[in-house]
Every structure is written in C-alpha cells, then in structure tokens.
C-alpha cells in the first residue's frame, strides 16, 4: 500500500509538471522536452506519435465526436483537426486542465471533467463517432452488472445517430509485447492477459484479443 501511494504521489507530481509545460510551451517544443526528460511519462503524454492511432481514419468533416477518457489530450487534438465538433470526457480534473490548455486553440472542442457513467444522462444522442482509446477496459468501473463490457457498448450506441460508429482501441491481451515478457499494463503483472485473466471475475478490468 505504501509503494502504491508513493507511485500515485510521483504521478501526481509529474501531472502538475506536465500542466506547467503545456502552459508555458507549444507543441513545437514538446520533442525537445521529451529528449531532456528521458522519462516514458512525458513521452507518452507529449509525443505527436500518439496521433497516429487515429490520424489515418477517414472521419467525416462535418461529424460530431464524443471522446471517452481523453486523458491529457494526446489524441484529442488529432480528432479536433478532422471534424466539426468534439466533446471530450476525462475523470481526472488535472488531466482535463492539461487537455484544455494544450488544445486551447481548438474552437470546436469542449472538455468536461467526469466519468462516462456519471455524465451519460447529460450527453447528446446524435454523435457520428464515439472514440474509446484505452477506455473500454474500464467498463467495470462504470457498470456494476454481470456484463459490464456489453452494457458499455449498448449504452454508447444510445448516443449515436443512425449509421454512427464506435471506435475502440485497447491493448491486445495476447500481443507480442506480453509474450516477450512485458508487464500487463492494467495490473503490472506478467502473463495474466495471455492466461485470459484466470481467477478474475467480471468486475475486474481486462483487455481483449483481436478476435474477441
């Protein structure tokens, strides 16, 4: 418990530093900052490579998009550059501030603090796309029933217009990095995703294989 608390404190300190960075510098400076920091935390949150996950996708230019769990906005800017309107949700208010600050010039973007389950009744029901980058695994945090992932998808569909799409990006639980000995990102343990989370109940977060 002490180790976990120390880890959380360290991450909060880095988040506060990240907020100062996006307040004082532009995206043109981020690569230099990443090189100086030599820390995966800053690489993950500041690298323009994060855009690649959706840069290729043919969004309709007049589209409305809901982004669930936007984190610090590493992907948000990419979406906002491609569509008419973006609504982003982020549970952590500090991360929401970072997102708003780094994307402050995006006039088509609104960012709110709150989890999907708490905000769901306030959301519109005519989005063209709903984007879940890393958030689908958190379904058990939002829904306490026996099939939280099914419930999450069904709930999200209620906020799409006819013909709308849900875009999901999450770790492949049997991806090569896990066969190579990397820790499972949700639990910082080894091979549990490859073993299909044996012993876990439906109320634990998990990742999926491509086939799943």
Where are these regions (language model features)?
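Conserved class I S-adenosyl-L-methionine
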Residues: 61-71, 167-190
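N-terminal auxiliary segments of SAM/dcSAM-dependent transferases
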Residues: 1-25
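A short acidic, Gly/Pro-enriched loop at the edge of an enzyme's catalytic core
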Residues: 121-130
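Conserved SAM-binding strand-loop segment of SAM-dependent methyltransferases
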Residues: 105-118
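Conserved SAM-binding loop of SAM-dependent methyltransferases across substrates and taxa
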Residues: 72-84
């Amino acid at each position: 418990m002490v180790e976990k608390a120390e880890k959380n404190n360290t991450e909060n300190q880095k988040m506060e530093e990240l907020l100062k960075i996006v307040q004082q510098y532009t995206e043109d400076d981020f690569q230099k900052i990443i090189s100086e920091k030599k820390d995966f935390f800053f690489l993950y949150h500041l690298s323009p490579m994060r855009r690649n996950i959706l840069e290729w996708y043919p969004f309709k230019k007049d589209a409305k998009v809901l982004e669930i769990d936007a984190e610090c906005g590493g992907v948000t800017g990419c979406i906002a550059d491609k569509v008419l309107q973006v609504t982003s949700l982020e549970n952590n208010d500090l991360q929401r501030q970072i997102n708003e600050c780094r994307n402050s010039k995006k006039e088509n973007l609104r960012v709110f603090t709150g989890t999907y389950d708490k905000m769901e009744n306030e959301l519109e029901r005519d989005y063209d796309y709903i984007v879940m980058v890393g958030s689908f695994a958190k379904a058990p945090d939002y829904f306490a029933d026996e099939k939280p992932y099914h419930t999450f998808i069904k709930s999200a569909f209620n906020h799409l217009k006819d013909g709308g799409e849900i875009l999901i990006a999450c770790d492949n639980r049997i991806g090569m990095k896990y066969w190579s000995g990397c820790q499972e990102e949700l639990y910082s343990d080894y091979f549990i995703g490859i073993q299909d989370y044996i012993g876990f109940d439906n109320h634990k977060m998990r990742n999926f294989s491509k086939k799943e």
